[in-house]
């Protein structure tokens, strides 16, 4: 390789002219201090080579080339050097001293010097850009120089790296160290094929030889000692070599050639020294062909250059490297240069862009030099870039990219090389050689990732390389990458250009550049983005999310800036999901609306080509991998990293980046992206960001409403979400990502989850599957995230714009996408079909029409719409959105997290809620329902709604999927998310599916709650994110954590909602339902993972609990019912919605979910009834199943899933519960009751177990009943109905339960109780009364328990509601019971589902869900929790003891959890995700409890409370198993 590289370098020698500047400087210095310099060179070369492998590879190559480039090269070099010298004389001189000192301090010194060098290099690079541009040759040399620069720095680092590259880190060492370290090790070692990859030993040998003066340069040493075979291995190198030779041959000609190369030289340089320079060399030409790939990655691979090329490409190997490396490296390293981000020297940007562009675009001509720009032009470019860089530095907080960048190097490098890669690329860091570690590491990372991942960077298929690299990145990104990406890219963001380069950056970066936006424009845009982002972020209070959020946003959005947003994020999302989703989506969806824009954007120029091409092509096609990989890689963050994560996101992603609420979703673009994208679609990119933020915010609301209205159908919106979403949902709205784990990708989860779930089915499941499944969690996540985002975007876009399109698109697209995704996610697939409508039969069944769109849509329409439709809900959503954004942001972040973990995604989902909330919010916002739904379930909810359709589709498929099992699971998970998420959606999907419509809405609504709750939990969920499962839906934690931030806002909203609690009441009911469902589902889900028996028991318990929840249910029903029962449920939904709207923050928040739930449940109910009982049972059950099943699998999928599941469940369940409760309160309620009552249903559910998690819960109650239900004194004992019908708690009774011991004691009792409860559920008015009493007690005890005051009001409401409900329910018994039961179930479901976390970690999930409220309600929650506990107790008889109540279910755990939860809650509130692990759960639980319990309880959240509690309960039961998890925290 080295030889080859040398050859390349040799050839490059000419290039070396430019190289010579740096390299020459090095060389000159090396020459001067030949020995030393040689050593230096050697070291440089050696290490450089290694580093080179990193990115420095190029520089190393160059260095080596120049130095080692060989004797002959030396001559040329000398010539070149002189030439370059002239050009670079000053640089060289500058460098020379540096070099010389470096030479002196050969190892580390050199490294340090190199740092300086690099710093100077920046100058050099810039100069070089100007100087080397003497000829294209120069340009090439530029490349070479860059390489050398990179190399030099790298070499220094490398040398140091090899030698003391870690120590070298002193300067460049850092980046280099990392880069080289990693690169050296990773790249150097693994990819010896590519750049002169010096094995450590080889490099060391070379270094020694050089040091000893045996050889002039490492390159020479290698040339002499390394078999050409190796060199040849690097085709790129060989080509480069040829090219180099060509160039060498034509030092001057390179000018001409460079001209050609100009178009390619950079790439050539970059790609392979000469590979790009098609003209220069055939090989160049070949490379150019591969360049895009090769250069991009292959190029990097192709030779050191390849690395550099990649770097160069990525980082702007040639120019950028020089510039970037030089400038950025130096600067970046220092961190001054904003990383070259924009800076990477123009080169980076250009180079990267160029490289990337060349890669992607096929070499848009090196950015600068490659452009064949004149020196002045190059200089100008450099200056512009520098300015941009400065701006970035200043503006982008990350501007300092270096810190980020370097860290990136270190972080990135370590992190996932890819990240660095991305980052490097992204951050331009790649460019930073010194940052070689940092910057180049990025590239290196890319290479590394590629190399390590695809060791043969060179070996890597040049063509595949980029893709793989990206994929690698994505994957790497997926995890760390995601985060890194998020973070790094976040950092990278600063470099936006790069950032673009970064995960998305790669694509994005180039895109940006290629975008045709001038650096200034870019900078401005960035600034704008930044500003808005910042604003948004602050606005969102997504501090947590910020980075990710920001990251994603930047990554997604920022990078593209607004355009990038579209372009960037969407593309990534696009790529990932899009490509899956967007692919079609964008492609198709591109037409979608926003998507189109996105697509367009993507398409647009570089991005288009790049993303689209890449993304589109690969993404679209293979896109998935590519998408995730490429785009994702790009996205990296993924949103799904990871989401992201991604995102993001998420993200997942992250992705919150969207910063703005919308963005937040995992996909900032998604959510925000969605809207933003949507907006973007609407707005132009530039505006997009800002507008997006602003608009998104406003729009979110507005759009939510508008969209909602626009969706008018809600359907569209929903559809959008659901439909479009269907696709979007799946993709965007579906948020397959969202729904999917990518939901996990936070957003993803729900969003992903939702979408994924829904479409998510498509993406969701896919995502989920992917993510969750493992489809690549990363990918998935990323995808999810992306998808999520995309989904969101799509959804939003669809929603916003294309509602129809969405629908249309959705169905088809979704289908397609789903298929695509599904392809990935079986569930998805099923879903897809479902989404199509069919699959979702459950949903469909409920809404056949709307399955996807139908149910989803329908749901959305009705439900989704309903709530959504209502402006308020919309608003709600929007509100939620707003906070959700926070959440979302968080979520997105979570997304990022989520992606990575389902959890995050999950979290995201719930968190998603956060993210989804973000997404949900975002999307939901966008979607409105989505917002609410989405938001609510957002992840799940929104998504749910979105998901619903997806969910519906998914859900139904879920069932199928459920059947589908994993997919199902995933699907379910997704669906689950779908379910729960979907649940919401699920309702749509699940119940509706069941509630589907409603639910979705409800979900959203409820989700809102969850969402809000989530958001709140978001925060906690965010924490939850950790919670993961909990997260999922609620999760949210992932998102939440950031969400937490968001949460805060969300929390507020939550709190608001809390206040809204009354609404909550209503919502509560729905939540109840939902919760029940959720919980059930969750339970199923949860249990599933746990032990089935446990699960069953848990579910049963939950079911029982649900029964206990009757009050809640009644409450719910009452409220909901009041609202209109089932029909109401739309009404209610509306109500809820209103509430949701009203309380998106308020009502919705706590109620958020509740309210929304209520509404949604209404919706759900709507469907529920529609779904009707049977469905409810079936659907609800199904949803349950879905939820449950989904949950189960999701659970399996993990807590994450749970989250989504939970979300779904929550959403679904909750809504379900609510729906049923609501709907039938008679219907559903009955249903539920029947279910619960029926236990059969529960059993059935049980059967459905998975599917019927919901039922199962009831069933479980059967099974488990004793546990919670039997909590200590009978509910009746504990709770005495008052004349008012408000249950009073016998605190003496309850409190004991509070104690873990008591709880434990009660645990058995609980069982007893449970049964009674169930009976009550079935026909135990007393217990119901008990419930009432409980409620009362709750009230009563609530205060005692906790700050009932806070709680109290709600509780009072709750009580009233409860009383009402109770009465109604009571009378309804069926209803009430169901209410209770359902609520219970809901509780459980919610708790479980809602808690999803519960399922997952009911606690966290729920917490997620609940958390939000919890957080919001946190205090309340505390009391509420306690109350909830009480309520739960009430609700859940098991909860008799307040905590005991929970406890019973969770019994000790629950109790403890609850207590802990409370504690946690507080913490969580703090966002601690307490329970962190399950703190989340705990938190979740807490939230669950509180949210569920108290908030719900209080508010009527009883349902939710129940849910929450149930969640807790669920947790408890699940806690035992999963419950343990749940309990775990405790």
From Swiss-Prot:
Protein name from the UniProt record: B-cell CLL/lymphoma 9-like protein
Region of interest (Disordered), residue spans: 1-101, 155-187, 246-353, 398-439, 473-503, 821-1076, 1250-1279, 1310-1331
Biased composition (Basic and acidic residues): 81-93
UniProt biased composition (Low complexity): 19-34, 156-165, 409-426, 485-503, 960-971, 979-994, 1031-1060
Primary role: Transcriptional regulator that may act as an activator. Plays a role for mesoderm patterning in early embryogenesis.
Classification lineage: Eukaryota, Metazoa, Chordata, Craniata, Vertebrata
Compositionally biased tracts (Polar residues): 8-18, 247-264, 278-287, 875-891, 920-930, 944-953
Predominant localisation class: nucleus
Source species: Danio rerio (Zebrafish)
Keywords from the UniProt entry: Activator, Developmental protein, Nucleus, Transcription, Transcription regulation
């Amino acid at each position: 390789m080295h030889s080859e590289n040398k050859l390349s370098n040799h050839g490059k020698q000419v290039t070396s002219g430019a190289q010579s500047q740096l390299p020459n400087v090095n060389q000159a210095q090396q020459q001067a201090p030949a020995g030393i310099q040689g050593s230096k060179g050697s070291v440089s070369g050696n290490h450089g080579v290694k580093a080179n492998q990193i990115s420095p590879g190029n520089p190393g190559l160059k260095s080596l080339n120049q130095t080692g480039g060989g004797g002959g090269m030396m001559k040329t070099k000398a010539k070149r050097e002189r030439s370059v010298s002239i050009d670079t004389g000053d640089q060289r001189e500058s460098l020379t001293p540096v070099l010389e000192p470096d030479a002196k301090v050969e190892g580390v010194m050199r490294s340090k010097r190199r740092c300086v060098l690099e710093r100077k290099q920046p100058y050099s690079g810039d100069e070089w850009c100007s100087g080397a541009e003497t000829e294209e040759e120069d340009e090439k040399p530029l490349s070479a120089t860059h390489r050398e620069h990179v190399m030099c720095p790298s070499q220094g680092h490398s040398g140091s790296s090899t030698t003391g590259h870690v120590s070298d880190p002193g300067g460049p060492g850092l980046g280099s160290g990392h880069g080289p370290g990693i690169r050296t090790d990773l790249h150097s070692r693994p990819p010896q094929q590519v750049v002169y990859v010096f094995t450590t030993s080889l490099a060391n040998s070379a270094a020694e030889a050089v040091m000893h003066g045996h050889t002039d340069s490492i390159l020479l040493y290698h040339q002499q000692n390394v078999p050409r075979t190796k060199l040849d291995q690097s085709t790129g190198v060989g080509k480069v070599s040829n090219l180099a030779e060509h160039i060498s041959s034509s030092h001057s000609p390179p000018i001409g050639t460079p001209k050609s190369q100009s178009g390619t030289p950079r790439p050539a340089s970059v790609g392979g020294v000469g590979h790009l320079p098609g003209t220069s060399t055939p090989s160049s030409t070949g490379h150019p062909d591969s360049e895009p790939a090769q250069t991009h990655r292959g190029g990097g691979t192709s030779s050191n250059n390849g690395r550099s090329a990649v770097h160069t490409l990525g980082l702007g190997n040639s120019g950028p490297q020089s510039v970037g490396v030089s400038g950025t490296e130096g600067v970046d390293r220092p961190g001054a240069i904003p990383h070259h981000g924009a800076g990477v020297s123009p080169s980076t940007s250009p180079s990267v862009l160029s490289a990337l562009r060349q890669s992607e675009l096929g070499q848009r001509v090196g950015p600068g030099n490659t452009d064949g720009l004149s020196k002045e032009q190059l200089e100008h470019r450099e200056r512009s870039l520098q300015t941009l860089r400065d701006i970035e530095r200043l503006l982008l907080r990350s501007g300092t990219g270096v810190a980020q960048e370097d860290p990136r190097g270190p972080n990135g490098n370590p992190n996932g090389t890819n990240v660095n890669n991305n980052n490097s690329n992204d951050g331009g860091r790649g460019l930073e050689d010194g940052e070689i570690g940092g910057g180049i590491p990025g590239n290196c990372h890319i290479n590394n990732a590629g190399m390590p991942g695809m060791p043969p960077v060179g070996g890597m298929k040049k063509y595949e390389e980029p893709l793989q690299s990206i994929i690698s990145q994505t994957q790497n990104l997926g995890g760390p990458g995601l985060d890194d990406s998020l973070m790094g890219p976040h950092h990278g963001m600063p470099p936006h250009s790069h950032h673009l380069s970064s995960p998305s950056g790669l694509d994005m970066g180039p895109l940006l550049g290629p975008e045709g936006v001038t650096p200034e424009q870019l900078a401005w845009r960035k600034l704008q983005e930044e500003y808005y982002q910042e604003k948004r972020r602050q606005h969102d209070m997504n501090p947590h999310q910020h980075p990710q959020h920001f990251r994603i946003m930047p990554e997604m959005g920022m990078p593209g800036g607004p355009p990038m947003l579209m372009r960037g994020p969407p593309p990534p999302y696009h790529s990932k999901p899009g490509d899956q989703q967007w692919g079609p989506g964008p492609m198709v969806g591109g037409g979608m609306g926003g998507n189109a824009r996105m697509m367009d954007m993507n398409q647009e120029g570089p991005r288009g080509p790049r993303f689209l091409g890449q993304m589109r092509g690969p993404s679209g096609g293979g896109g998935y991998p590519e998408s995730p990989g490429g785009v994702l890689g790009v996205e990296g963050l993924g949103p799904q990293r990871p989401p992201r994560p991604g995102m993001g996101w998420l993200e997942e992603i992250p992705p919150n980046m969207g910063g703005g609420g919308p963005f937040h979703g995992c996909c900032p673009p998604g959510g925000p992206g969605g809207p933003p994208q949507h907006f973007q679609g609407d707005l132009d990119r530039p505006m997009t960001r800002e507008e997006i933020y602003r608009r998104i915010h406003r729009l979110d609301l507005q759009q939510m409403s508008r969209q909602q209205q626009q969706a008018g159908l809600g359907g569209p919106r929903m559809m959008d979400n659901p439909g479009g979403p269907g696709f979007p949902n799946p993709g965007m709205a579906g948020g397959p990502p969202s729904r999917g784990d990518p939901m996990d990708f936070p957003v993803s989860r729900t969003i992903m989850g939702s979408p994924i779930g829904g479409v998510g089915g498509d993406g969701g499941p896919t995502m989920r599957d992917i993510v969750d499944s493992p489809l690549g969690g990363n990918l998935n996540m990323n995808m999810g995230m992306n998808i999520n985002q995309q989904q969101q975007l799509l959804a939003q876009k669809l929603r916003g714009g294309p509602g129809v399109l969405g629908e249309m698109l959705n169905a088809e697209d979704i289908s397609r996408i789903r298929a695509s995704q599904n392809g990935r996610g079986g569930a998805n697939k099923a879903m897809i079909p479902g989404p199509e409508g069919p699959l979702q039969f459950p949903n469909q069944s409920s809404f056949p029409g709307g399955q996807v769109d139908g149910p989803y849509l329908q749901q959305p329409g009705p439900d989704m719409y309903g709530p959504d439709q209502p402006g308020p809900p919309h608003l709600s959503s929007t509100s939620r959105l707003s906070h959700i954004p926070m959440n979302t942001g968080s979520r997105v972040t979570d997304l990022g997290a989520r992606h990575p973990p389902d959890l995050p995604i999950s979290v995201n989902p719930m968190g998603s809620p956060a993210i989804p909330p973000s997404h949900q919010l975002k999307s939901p916002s966008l979607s409105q329902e989505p917002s609410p739904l989405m938001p609510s379930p957002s992840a799940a909810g929104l998504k749910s709604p979105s998901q619903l359709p997806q969910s519906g589709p998914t859900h139904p498929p879920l069932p199928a999927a459920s059947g589908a099992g994993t997919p199902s699971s995933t699907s379910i998970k997704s669906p689950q998310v779908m379910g729960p998420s979907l649940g919401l959606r699920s309702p749509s999907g699940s119940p509706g599916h069941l509630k589907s419509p409603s639910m979705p809405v409800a979900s959203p609504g409820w989700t809102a709650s969850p969402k809000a709750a989530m958001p709140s939990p978001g925060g906690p969920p965010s924490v939850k994110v950790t919670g993961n499962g909990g997260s999922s839906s609620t999760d949210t934690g992932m998102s939440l954590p950031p969400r937490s931030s968001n949460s805060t806002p969300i929390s507020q909203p939550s709190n608001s909602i809390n206040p809204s609690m009354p609404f909550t009441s209503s919502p509560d009911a729905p939540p109840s339902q939902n919760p029940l469902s959720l919980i059930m589902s969750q339970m199923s889900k949860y249990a599933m993972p746990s032990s089935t028996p446990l699960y069953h028991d848990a579910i049963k318990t939950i079911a029982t609990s649900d029964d206990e929840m009757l009050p809640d249910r009644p409450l719910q029903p009452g409220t909901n019912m009041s609202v209109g029962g089932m029909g109401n449920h739309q009404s209610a939904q509306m109500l809820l919605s209103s509430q949701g709207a009203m309380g998106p923050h308020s009502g919705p928040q706590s109620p958020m979910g509740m309210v929304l739930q209520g509404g949604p449940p209404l919706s759900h109910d709507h469907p529920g009834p529609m779904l009707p009982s049977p469905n409810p049972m079936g659907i609800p059950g199904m949803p349950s199943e879905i939820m449950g099943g989904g949950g189960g699998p999701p659970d399996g999928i993990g807590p994450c899933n749970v989250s989504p599941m939970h979300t779904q469940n929550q959403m679904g369940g909750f809504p379900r519960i609510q729906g049923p409760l609501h709907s039938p309160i008679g219907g559903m309620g009955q249903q539920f009751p029947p279910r619960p009552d029926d236990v059969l249903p529960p059993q059935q559910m049980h059967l459905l177990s998975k599917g019927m998690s919901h039922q199962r819960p009831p069933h479980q109650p059967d099974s488990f009943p004793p546990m919670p239900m039997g909590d200590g004194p009978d509910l009746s004992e504990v709770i005495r109905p008052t004349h008012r019908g408000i249950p009073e708690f016998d605190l003496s009774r309850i409190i004991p339960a509070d104690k873990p011991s008591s709880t434990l004691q009660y645990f058995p009792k609980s069982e007893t109780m449970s049964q009674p409860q169930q009976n009550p559920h079935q026909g135990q008015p007393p217990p119901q009364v008990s419930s009432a009493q409980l409620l009362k007690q709750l009230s009563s005890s609530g205060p005692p328990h906790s700050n009932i005051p806070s709680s109290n009001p709600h509780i009072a409401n709750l009580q009233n509601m409860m009383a009402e409900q109770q009465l109604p329910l009571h009378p309804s018994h069926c209803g009430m019971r169901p209410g209770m039961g359902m609520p219970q179930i809901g509780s459980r479901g919610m708790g479980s589902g809602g808690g999803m976390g519960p399922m997952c970690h009911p606690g966290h999930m729920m917490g997620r869900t609940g958390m939000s409220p919890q957080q919001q309600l946190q205090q309340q929650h505390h009391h509420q929790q306690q109350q909830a506990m009480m309520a739960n107790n009430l609700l859940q008889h098991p909860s008799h003891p307040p905590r005991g109540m929970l406890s019973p279910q969770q019994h000790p755990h629950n109790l403890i959890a609850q207590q802990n939860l409370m504690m946690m809650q507080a913490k969580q509130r703090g966002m601690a995700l307490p329970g962190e692990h399950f703190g989340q759960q705990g938190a979740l639980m807490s939230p669950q409890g509180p949210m569920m319990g108290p908030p719900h309880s209080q508010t009527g959240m009883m349902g939710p409370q129940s849910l929450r509690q149930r969640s807790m309960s669920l947790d408890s039961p699940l806690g035992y198993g999963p419950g343990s998890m749940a309990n775990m925290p405790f």
